Amino acid sequence: MWKFTSSATKRIGNSLSSNNNNGSLLFSLNFNGSNNNNNNESSKPITAANTQNNSTTKSIDNNNNNTNNSNSNNNNNDNIKNNNKFNRASHRSNITLVAINNKDISQMTNLLADSGISVSKISNKKISLASKINTLNKLNSSLLHLNSINNSLTNSNNNNDNNNLIDNNNNDNYNNDSISSSSSSSSLSESSQTLSSASSSASSSSSSTLSSSSSVSSKSLNNNNNNNNSRFNNEFNDVRVLGKGGFGIVFQCCNIFDQMEYAVKRIKVNQKIPTKELMEVRAMARLNHPNIVRYYGSWIEEEIITNNSIDHYGENDNNLFENIDSFPSSSYSSVSAAASSSSLVSNSSNSYSNNKATYISNSSSSSSSSSSCSYSIGNGNLSISECTNDDNNNYNQLKQKKFSLYIQMELCKYSTLRNLINEINNIKSITSIQSTSSIANPIGTNILISLDIKQCREITRQILVALKYIHSQGFVHRDITPDNVFVCQSPFGIKIGDFGLATTIESLTVDSNNNNNNNINNNNNNNKKVGGLGTYLYSSNEQEQGDNYNQKTDLYSVGVIFFEMLSQFKTTMERSTTLSKLKKSLSVLKTNPNLKQKYPNDTDFIDHLIQSFATRPFSNQISTDYDNFPPKNFLIN
């Protein structure tokens, strides 16, 4: 059992234990490895203690750590790097990271990677605020405080000194907002008074507030195996989730250099240069408009998938972070079946992405030997993402290269139009509009918004202004929904984002010409339009059916959004039923006669936007004059 601690936890530990007159005390990091039995004491690093064959934990006195820490950094770093036996012994170890925040977890993961330690399982636990003092009291007599090990990471790469160990005194923020720790269960052993590994059972009076979530440690850390080379981990902190779905996951985070907040979108890809996903990047890079979410940059990072990591496409990120109860842009379903040979264990899908599933095949010949493999199925490609083999507790690792595309964008702090509409359906004015991630408005005051007819018109007008610009640059968005329209200013500064389904007008035109002039079979047409693309309630019939279409399809979506804002549905079922009816009838009068009577001019404009593809106007044919919107004469020369 190898035990360590880190600088971030030391500072919090010292502050919490000051009331108890317990100098430097903190949580430990345990390495429980079956190969440690034969280790010699002389071959161990001086900064670790081996307790595999002893019930009593050996400790190292660090009372003078604050004065001697700087002198021992280089020695400790050399001991870690040069001790090959320790590295080999840890190859099949179970590592439990016990820490205060995700930055602490990342730093310790850096240490493992920097030391050349390869492990088969990494688990972590986060200690809640309420339990820290009690835990400190219980662990005071036995936990090792080896701050120098974590500090050695600072000296391992002088050029990256500031990037790898940025703490910024944000520990209190991390306690509330950071990555949730993970482990199947937890225990506080009365005899050894140490936090056990992830697989132990919960058993202690002081463990009431030890937080743990189902085993997702590999997911939270598999992107950090080469953390020193991760731009995202080195340049951003205060990470929390804004939303997620089939497209990937979007984080709110703070850049450690300019101290500005950004939205960073992460998309898992199978190749280093993902042509399809880069369409979104290229679209955003070419667009510069006040009503479009600003693009700052993008990059690709390589990750290592091991035998304990979750399936590449089946990643369930809502276990990794706190306060992400709902994201309306995605839906998830889970199916499980017991069978001796195979089972379909998960399925993740949404209205604008292909279904992707994780397929598990299990077989066993005896109680002591079993194997399993999982495969990622998506877009017609099959790739192995996980294989495990258990033979008398010996694990074989399969490492496979995967990549993540990161897109750094402007952060819209107030809300999405979806959240705004949902709130308005229940109350006519909103106090302090916040997104699903509870982002307070930047000026710290309440925002009073009433979604009256004037506001509905202004939102619609700004969306059309943005679409005019997008279309003029040769792009079609294809997914204009309330979820992709962001409220970035008070009272209403509307911006369009999420260009994940954007394509060029030229590609749609080429496809149309191929189908009409050459009678090419759609199944063999590489540029063919896919039916069902987009979000069903907001996509036009021609786009839904995969017929020939162009930038006019975005105008149908705008008409539906305008209709929804005026209708103010009280339930999700009412919204779904009514918008489906509008999609079939293409008439406000046939869908909601009362609304037609209440807002005759506005509903006439909606009818103009949602009419059939052949007669629907282009965006540059619609007047967006502020004083005369919606226009009475719908078309302009």
Swiss-Prot record:
SUPFAM superfamilies: Protein kinase-like (PK-like). The active site is at D479 (proton acceptor). Residues 36-88, 155-234 are annotated as: Disordered. Pfam families: Pkinase. Its EC number is 2.7.11.1. Keywords: ATP-binding, Kinase, Nucleotide-binding, Serine/threonine-protein kinase, Transferase. GO terms for biological process: cellular response to amino acid starvation; negative regulation of translational initiation in response to stress. Gene3D superfamilies: Phosphorylase Kinase, domain 1 (3.30.200.20), Transferase(Phosphotransferase) domain 1 (1.10.510.10). GO terms for molecular function: ATP binding; eukaryotic translation initiation factor 2alpha kinase activity; protein serine kinase activity. One of its GO terms (cellular component) is nucleus. PANTHER family: EUKARYOTIC TRANSLATION INITIATION FACTOR 2-ALPHA KINASE EIF2-ALPHA KINASE -RELATED (PTHR11042), SERINE_THREONINE-PROTEIN KINASE DDB_G0283065-RELATED (PTHR11042:SF191). This is Probable serine/threonine-protein kinase DDB_G0283065.
